[in-house]
UniProtKB/Swiss-Prot annotation:
CC per GO annotation: plasma membrane
PROSITE patterns (alphabetical): G_PROTEIN_RECEP_F1_2
Similarity-based family: Belongs to the G-protein coupled receptor 1 family.
Keyword Transmembrane: yes
Lineage of the species this protein comes from: Eukaryota, Metazoa, Ecdysozoa, Nematoda, Chromadorea
Record InterPro entries: GPCR1-like, GPCR_Rhodpsn, GPCR_Rhodpsn_7TM
Keywords for this protein: Cell membrane, G-protein coupled receptor, Membrane, Receptor, Transducer, Transmembrane, Transmembrane helix
UniProt-recorded name of the protein: Probable G-protein coupled receptor frpr-1
Membrane topology: Multi-pass membrane protein
TM segment ranges: 47-67, 85-105, 120-140, 180-200, 243-263, 277-297, 315-337
Listed SUPFAM superfamilies: Family A G protein-coupled receptor-like
Location relative to the cell: Cell membrane
Molecular function GO labels: G protein-coupled receptor activity
Length: 378
């Protein structure tokens, strides 16, 4: 490791100055746990919420989102709305995986040397990737809500330009395929927008070699760049832009769209797609509910300068909850989703059954040896 020189001193005086054996002290550049005391009650709370609940919910969410992505990608489920829900499931998978890294692995840094090392090595990639996935999830939710609003409230002429009502490639027409292509183009644009919006995060941290006084060994750590330490940048990008682009703006827009959808459904219901519309409305409601706490944390910091670690941990947990629970809504309220998933699960089980029977039938069953002679002759 570059810079490591065991002949140099590592005394309390040198550590207080941020150096040890010629290396920087891990955590010195941003005041990690090695240089500050953590309240025991909060440490226990953090372990339960981030160390236990988050990975448990996240693992279940990965399974649910994988099933959701599989189901919505089937030929008989193709429609403009389902294309958005497929993309949402994929982005939620990335959110959960990066949440394991950004929240759970970060929590384990206080308890594991390998967690400290790999957190630092992977941070420059995982940090912007996770935030890009969150941005995609937000805007895909908004786009799907708008698609749903067009489906229930717009005229047939306007509707044919933006959404496809049919949920089967076998009965769909050319306009359905054209509208699905439009949705795919919108998703690609959302992806590019997410990369552009989160590109500053790639220049916020850098990796250094350091000496861990906690584990008494050389390790790696992440430190903030001059950009991340700039007060004006933090205030404009993290406070104002995040509030408008990622928090208040989408939530208010979704409340308006959801309200319009519900009103339109009351006036004229569409039996063929009603379950899909209800599913989307509930997905939006879940999104709004899970974003109340992050909004509260953001406003407390913006208006009053209050930074509450307990609320921050809970808001991080709500991010994972939001990404993990959509499958429950899809399966409970989406009749097409439930029917399609059951069909493929049964088909998979039926394929395994003949294979198992073939393996068991490699030798003739003994029951044939017990048949009466007359039946054998026949």
């Amino acid at each position: 490791m570059e810079g490591l020189n065991m002949s140099l001193e590592c005394t309390p005086a040198s550590r207080s100055n941020g150096t040890c054996y010629g290396l920087a002290v891990c955590g010195y550049c941003y005041d990690f746990v090695e240089t500050r005391q953590v309240v025991k009650e909060y440490e226990q709370f953090n372990l339960v919420v981030i160390g236990l609940m988050l990975p448990l919910i996240g693992c279940l969410g990965l399974i649910g989102n994988a099933l959701s992505a599989f189901t919505y990608s089937r030929r008989e489920m193709i429609s403009s709305l389902n294309v958005y829900l497929f993309a949402l499931a994929c982005s939620d998978i990335v959110i959960i995986l990066t949440a394991f890294f950004l929240f759970f692995l970060e929590n384990m840094r206080k308890r594991s040397e390998w967690a400290t090392y790999y957190f630092a090595v992977l941070s420059p990639v995982m940090f912007p990737l996770g935030l890009t996935a969150q941005t995609m999830s937000v805007f895909i939710t908004v786009a799907s809500a708008f698609d749903c609003l067009v489906l229930v409230a717009a005229s047939e002429k306007f509707k044919s330009k933006f959404c496809s009502v049919n949920t089967s490639i076998l009965v769909g027409n050319f306009n359905d395929f054209k509208n699905v292509i439009v949705c795919l183009k919108i998703i690609v644009k959302i992806f590019l927008l997410g990369i552009f919006y989160n590109s500053p995060h790639m220049y916020e941290i850098y990796v250094i070699d350091c000496w861990s006084t906690m584990y008494n060994t050389a390790s790696k750590d992440v430190c903030p760049t001059a950009l991340r330490s700039n007060v004006d940048y933090v205030r404009i990008y993290y406070v104002y832009m995040y509030t408008i682009v990622m928090a208040v703006g989408p939530v208010l827009l979704l409340i308006v769209i959801n309200t319009a959808i519900v009103i339109s459904m009351r006036r004229s219901s569409s039996p063929n797609s009603e379950s899909d519309i209800i599913t989307l409305v509930l997905v939006v409601c879940l999104f709004i509910s899970c974003n109340v706490l992050p909004l509260t944390v953001n406003f407390l910091e913006l208006l009053f300068g209050i930074i509450n670690s307990y609320l921050i941990d809970l808001s991080n947990l709500m991010v994972v909850v939001n990404s993990s629970c959509n499958f429950l809504i899809y399966y409970t309220f989406g009749s097409n989703f439930r029917r399609t998933l059951r069909y493929y699960v049964r088909a998979a089980l039926n394929r395994r059954a003949p294979a198992q029977n073939a393996a068991n039938n490699r030798t003739p069953p003994r029951v044939k040896l017990c048949l009466p002679p007359t039946e054998v002759l026949i």
